[in-house]
Amino acid sequence: MKRALLFALAVAACQEELAQNTDPLPLNPETVGHFCQMNLLEHEGPKGQVHLEGLPGMPLFFSQVSDTVAYLRLPEQSHPILAIWVADMGAPGATWADPGADNWIDARTASYVVGAAIEGGMGAPEVVPFADPAAAKAFAARHGGNIMGLDAIPDSAVLAPSTQTAEGDGDYGRRLEALSDRAGG
């Protein structure tokens, strides 16, 4: 009986040592977005990272926080989510052009500004995270939007297609036809 108890304690101790580290990793020149596979340091606005069970030290990075939230809601996830980190846009020195490489906060406790008149790094509407609710309130006063927690962010804010403006891809059809004409189609 003593041996069985000692064995069980030893196994439990080993399992505790094997707990996966889910601390946020800083952005670096090799960090690319999960969806876009583009270098994240080349894009403005806040970023996100998701740590998955069984993939230690290899979080999925996202070029926009809205992409991070969208990933959480997609049914195709292959691994359980252990941690979700987003860039605190209220951190000292954080700007839209340079949101910071290591000012990560727990996405589950952040305050988000949703519906602000500002675009994220991929040119789509962004949900903007803050550790301090007062900083979120000040941002919303300047840029519009509503303040809410992660679970309250509506799917329409992160899963709906982005609408193009007149100055965006308004001539997409014309350019596509020109390519078809050149290709003999």
Model-derived features with residue positions:
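Sec-dependent bacterial lipoprotein signal peptides
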Residues: M1-A12
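Bacterial signal peptide processing site
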Residues: C14-E17
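Short, flexible, mixed-charge glycine/proline-rich loop motifs
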Residues: N21-P29
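Short cysteine-rich clusters marking metal-coordination/redox-active sites
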Residues: G33
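Cys/His-coordinated zinc-binding microdomains
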Residues: Q37
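Short, non-ligating residues that shape and space the ligands of small metal-coordination modules
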Residues: E42-G45
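Mid-length scaffold segments of soluble, non-membrane domains
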Residues: M58-I105, Y112, I118-G121
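C-terminal partner/receptor-binding element of secreted or periplasmic proteins
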Residues: A131-A135, F139-G185
